[in-house]
């Protein structure tokens, strides 16, 4: 059963390894609702979808954390992902769909722009 869901449009810095080699999604409000405010680690299943259907699948890990956890007044949440074949195909403007099920498994689905 799905217990949380977030949807966002991917930015250049989130997916372009030439723009940033950080492997992170920005921690938007909908992700904070799913993962909370504490550092957490998750197993994840990744998929890349286009008009052709699911083109790539993979498994990996995610880390939810506050990149400014040592700053007393500012927060900057990030969802770090390890290298994953489906994410290598992602582009700025694609849609990111993240769900978490009742067992704590996180599904990361990239949907190609225009699909």
Question: What do the predicted segments below correspond to?
Answer:
Residues 1-115:
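Intrinsically disordered, charged low-complexity linkers and terminal tails
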